[in-house]
Amino acid sequence: MAAPKSAVRKPRRKDKKNIAVGQAHIKSTFNNTIVSITDPTGAVISWASSGVVGYNGSRKSTPFAAQLAAESAARQAQEHGMKKVDVFVKGPGSGRETAIRSLQAAGLEVGSINDVTPQAHNGCRPPKRRRV
């Protein structure tokens, strides 16, 4: 009979990558803001979102939650030696500019800022108007 496997798994150790230049992808929707910091090839080094930082519901869509998410992602990336990022912003949300500013405030040098928001050429039907 085979020996039983232990129920406790060892957490995988994150090895330190030494990457000085990378990309910051900020996806800002009406409900949330997600910040991913990648190396130049696109492999994710660190990420954070408004929900991971500790906000729920409508508070996730605030600029302050986006600021905290960007600071958290920048801190993790700096542990891997990141110093300079090119920023790619996607989406119409309220946390766009705040996230870029907090990346700079966290100590990352921002090289360029590109808006990569997708534009539909008459694709999906948009959501209905709100009746408040």
Swiss-Prot record:
Keywords of this entry: Ribonucleoprotein, Ribosomal protein, RNA-binding, rRNA-binding
One of the record's GO cellular component terms: ribosome
GO biological process: translation
Region of interest: Disordered: 1-21
MF (Gene Ontology): rRNA binding; structural constituent of ribosome
Gene3D superfamilies hit by this protein: Ribosomal protein S11
Compositional bias of kind Basic residues: 7-16
Pfam family of the protein (one): Ribosomal_S11
Function as written in the Swiss-Prot or TrEMBL entry: Located on the platform of the 30S subunit, it bridges several disparate RNA helices of the 16S rRNA. Forms part of the Shine-Dalgarno cleft in the 70S ribosome.
Family per record: Belongs to the universal ribosomal protein uS11 family.
Subunit structure: Part of the 30S ribosomal subunit. Interacts with proteins S7 and S18. Binds to IF-3.
PANTHER family listed in its UniProt record: 40S RIBOSOMAL PROTEIN S14/30S RIBOSOMAL PROTEIN S11
Name the UniProt record assigns to this protein: Small ribosomal subunit protein uS11
Species whose genome carries this gene: Clavibacter michiganensis subsp. michiganensis (strain NCPPB 382)
